[in-house]
From Swiss-Prot:
This is Probable acyl-activating enzyme 8. Its EC number is 6.2.1.-. It comes from the Eukaryota. Keywords: Fatty acid metabolism, Ligase, Lipid metabolism. May act as an acid--thiol ligase that activates carboxylic acids by forming acyl-CoAs. The keyword Lipid metabolism applies. One of its GO terms (molecular function) is ligase activity. CDD domains: ttLC_FACS_AEE21_like. The keyword Lipid metabolism applies. InterPro entries: AMP-bd_C (IPR025110), AMP-bd_C_sf (IPR045851), AMP-binding_CS (IPR020845), AMP-dep_synth/lig_dom (IPR000873), ANL_N_sf (IPR042099).
Length: 544
C-alpha cells in the first residue's frame, strides 16, 4: 500500500468553518439565535450575516495572520464573530470583559491586534485602553439602540471607524470564506490569567478546534437541534467551542447579557432550554434563587468544569431538574478533555454517594488520546490508589500549538511528548481522575482564573507590605476566592486595615482579582530555605 498517498481530494485541511454553511442548508428555517424580546435569527440569516461581516473585514484589509479582537458580552454579534473573523482568514481573539483598561491594552499590544469589535456597553473601557497604545487597532462599535436607551450610552462615537451594522450592509453575502492553507494554521488566541506582567496567549489551530468541537458534542451526547443557553461567557476559551458545536447540530443559541437568576429561569421556561454550561458558581446562584421554589418543567443538562461543585449544591440542583455533568479542561486544551462518565450501576447508590462521585473530574473524553498523573521527580505514573498525588499530563489533538511569543513557556510545558498542566491530581482505583491542587497557583473564582503570583506582585507594591502570599480560600458561592496573608514593615506610624489593603488592590488591578480576605501575620511561615509555606497558609484559609 506504499503507493497510496494523500491527494487534494482526501487531504483538505480540517476546519469547523463549514459547520455554518451546512447549518444554513440543513436547518435554514430553524431558529439559530434568540436574544431579548425582539431579536430572532434563523440559520440562513446567521450565515448571511457572518459572510457579510467576513467580506467587509476582507475589504478593509483584514486577512490571513491578522489578529481581530472582540470585547463583548454574550450577544448575537459576539456569537457571529466566532465565525466571521476566521472566515475572513484572520485569527480570533476574545477578550475578558472583566479586565481593566490597562490589562486590555497589554493584550491588544501583545497579540498585535489590527481591529477591535466593541460591545457598546464596554466602549469606555475600549477607548481608555487604546489611548495607551502607539498603534491602536481599528475600532468597530457593536451598537444596540434598544439597549442604549436603557442607560449605557456611547460617549465617544468618534473614536469608532465603523458600526457593526454597517459592515453587514456593505458586505457581500456571496463571499467565499477563506479556507485555511493548513489545518495547523492558527484560528484563535486566548489569554489565560497572568496577563499583566507576562501575557500567556494560547494559540490553537483549525485542526485542534475542529477535533475538540466534535469531541465536546459526542462526550456530552448533544442531540440535533438542542436549545443552548449562553450562561458561559463566550470570551472564556471561545465558550469551550460550543459556538461552533451548536451550529454543527442546528441548535438554538439563547444569548443573554447578564447572569441574573430570575431571568435565567424565565429563559429556560420560555424557550425550552435543554443544555447550558457554566462555572460551579452558576449552579450555586440558580440553586439559591427564589425562582428555584418550583422544579423545572423538563430536565436541563448542565455541564460544569473547574473546581468541584459542593455536594450540597449538586444535590439541590439535581432536585430542581438539572442533570449535572462535571469535567476538566484548560484554555490550553480548548475545552473539556476529562469528564465524569457516569456508570449505570451508580444510579443505585445513595444521593450523597452519587454527588461524591460526580465531584471527581473523571476519565478522558472519547476524542482525546492520553491522560496520566506522574511523579514530578521520576516522571513515572503514580499508583492508582486515589491518594498518591502527581502532576496531570496530557496528549491529544486539541492541545494548543503553544504560547504566543513565549518560547520558554511553551518549551517548559511540552516535555517528553507530554503537555504538563501544572495541576496536581490522583487516579482512583477505577481509573477516574480527581484534581487535588493547582501547582501553578491559579485560583478559580467564579469560573475565572486568578493568578496568585500576580496578586502578590500588586501587594508588594504597597509601601506598608513586607511579605505577601495569596492562596485560595474555599467559598460556597464563588468556589474559591483570593485570600492574602500579609506581614507589615516594622516601624509604621500607622498600620493599614484589611479593607484598605483590599481597596488598594482593586485600584491596581481588575476588581475580581483582588483579595476578598486579608489576614495579618507577624511573619509568614517559611521553610529552612526561606520559601513561604503556602500549604500551611491554605489550611489556615480553609478554617477561617
Amino acid at each position: 500500500m506504499e503507493d497510496l498517498k494523500p491527494s487534494a481530494a482526501n487531504s483538505l485541511p480540517l476546519t469547523l468553518l463549514g459547520f455554518l454553511e451546512r447549518a444554513a442548508t440543513v436547518y435554514g428555517d430553524c431558529t439559530s439565535i434568540v436574544y431579548g424580546n425582539s431579536t430572532v435569527y434563523t440559520w440562513r440569516e446567521t450565515n448571511h450575516r457572518c459572510l457579510c461581516v467576513a467580506s467587509a473585514l476582507s475589504s478593509i484589509g483584514i486577512g490571513r495572520s491578522d489578529v481581530v479582537s472582540v470585547l463583548s458580552a454574550n450577544t448575537p454579534e459576539m456569537y457571529e464573530l466566532q465565525f466571521s473573523v476566521p472566515m475572513s482568514g484572520a485569527i480570533l481573539n476574545n477578550i475578558n470583559t472583566r479586565l481593566d483598561a490597562r490589562t486590555v491594552s497589554v493584550l491588544l499590544r501583545h497579540c498585535e491586534s489590527k481591529l477591535l469589535f466593541v460591545d457598546f456597553f464596554y466602549s469606555d473601557l475600549a477607548v481608555e485602553a487604546i489611548t495607551m497604545l502607539l498603534n491602536p487597532p481599528i475600532l468597530v462599535l457593536i451598537a444596540n439602540e434598544e439597549e442604549e436607551e436603557g442607560g449605557a450610552e456611547v460617549t465617544e462615537r468618534s473614536k469608532f471607524c465603523y458600526l457593526y451594522s454597517d459592515l453587514i450592509t456593505r458586505g457581500n453575502p456571496d463571499f467565499k470564506w477563506i479556507r485555511p492553507g493548513s489545518e495547523w494554521d492558527p484560528i484563535v488566541v486566548n489569554y489565560t490569567s497572568g496577563t499583566t506582567s507576562s501575557p500567556k496567549g494560547v494559540v490553537h489551530c483549525h485542526r485542534g478546534i475542529f477535533v475538540m468541537t466534535l469531541d465536546s458534542l459526542t462526550d456530552w451526547a448533544v442531540p440535533k437541534t438542542p436549545v443552548y443557553l449562553w450562561t458561559l461567557p463566550i470570551f472564556h476559551a471561545n465558550g469551550w467551542t460550543y459556538p461552533w458545536g451548536i451550529a454543527a447540530v442546528g441548535g438554538t443559541n439563547v444569548c443573554v447579557r447578564k447572569l441574573h437568576a430570575p431571568s435565567i429561569y424565565h429563559l429556560i421556561r420560555d424557550h425550552g432550554v435543554t443544555h447550558m454550561y457554566g462555572a460551579p458558581i452558576v449552579l450555586q446562584i440558580l440553586s439559591a434563587s427564589q425562582e428555584s421554589d418550583q422544579p423545572l418543567k423538563s430536565p436541563v443538562n448542565f455541564l460544569t468544569a473547574g473546581s468541584s461543585p459542593p455536594a450540597t449544591v449538586l444535590l439541590r440542583a439535581e432536585s430542581l431538574g438539572f442533570i449535572v455533568s462535571h469535567g476538566y479542561g484548560l484554555t490550553e486544551t480548548a475545552g473539556v478533555i476529562v469528564s465524569c462518565a457516569w456508570k449505570p450501576n451508580w444510579n443505585r447508590l445513595p444521593a450523597s454517594d452519587q454527588a461524591q462521585l460526580k465531584s471527581r473530574q473523571g476519565v478522558r473524553t472519547v476524542g482525546f488520546s492520553e491522560i496520566d498523573v506522574v511523579d514530578p521527580e521520576s516522571g513515572r505514573s503514580v499508583e492508582r490508589d486515589g491518594e498518591t498525588v502527581g502532576e496531570i499530563v496530557l496528549r491529544g489533538s486539541s492541545i494548543m500549538l503553544g504560547y504566543l511569543k513565549n518560547p520558554i513557556g511553551t518549551q517548559n510545558s511540552f516535555k517528553n511528548g507530554w503537555f504538563f498542566t501544572g495541576d496536581l491530581g490522583v487516579i482512583h482505583g477505577d481509573g477516574y481522575l480527581e484534581i487535588k491542587d493547582r501547582s501553578k497557583d491559579v485560583i478559580i473564582s467564579g469560573g475565572e482564573n486568578v493568578s496568585s503570583v500576580e496578586v502578590e506582585a500588586v501587594l508588594y507594591t504597597n509601601p506598608a507590605v513586607n511579605e505577601a502570599a495569596v492562596v485560595a480560600r474555599p467559598d460556597e458561592f464563588w468556589g474559591e476566592t483570593p485570600c492574602a496573608f500579609v506581614s507589615l514593615k516594622p516601624g509604621l506610624t500607622r498600620k493599614p486595615t484589611d479593607k484598605e489593603i483590599i481597596e488598594y488592590c482593586k485600584y491596581k488591578m481588575p476588581r475580581y482579582m483582588a483579595p476578598k480576605t486579608v489576614s495579618f501575620l507577624e511573619e509568614l511561615p517559611k521553610t529552612s530555605t526561606g520559601k513561604i509555606i503556602k500549604s500551611l497558609l491554605k489550611e489556615i484559609a480553609k478554617n477561617m
